[in-house]
């Protein structure tokens, strides 16, 4: 009897192992956690394995890229800024659902990162002060637009690297799609906003405030 039970358990374990090997696909939860870790650590080689950007609207990214080229922002400057924004990123997976037949999955995650609202507030104060100081300088001594942009970038990076900054936690549904038989994160605006500590929400609120003030 014991041998029969043992044989059944071994057989079941073998079948499960073969099934797992046959799929050759990491779960949606595994991909989500590994993708978030790659983003936090700014692992540029690993990011394409977990993130799918094919369905994203890249118009804004294109405009930012053109602006970066105009002021000659280096890859090092950009990497330093991104890493400062994601260095405190942490997460807790709440649940995961997969629908391989439909090619979709959803992982509910509690994301924690820096709260960008107070950081943006500090940045605007310092940027305004710098701009005013520049405008008061004599002709020929005023910094160029490129120099001012570099200064703003450094100011924001320094603010993000402060210790003791506030954090915010947001629960979001992280969507994934099957790409060549593997799950990949296809972030929507809510996910991006949570990853960036509410930066998109803060920007929209600021834009609305400026529009109301100008009306």
Roles of regions detected by a PLM:
Residues 150-166:
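Acidic, glycine-rich flexible loop segments
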Residues 101-113:
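A short hydrophobic beta-strand element
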Residues 23-94, 118:
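Core segments of small alpha/beta cavity-forming domains
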Residues 17-20:
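C-terminal motif of bacterial Sec signal peptides marking the signal peptidase cleavage site
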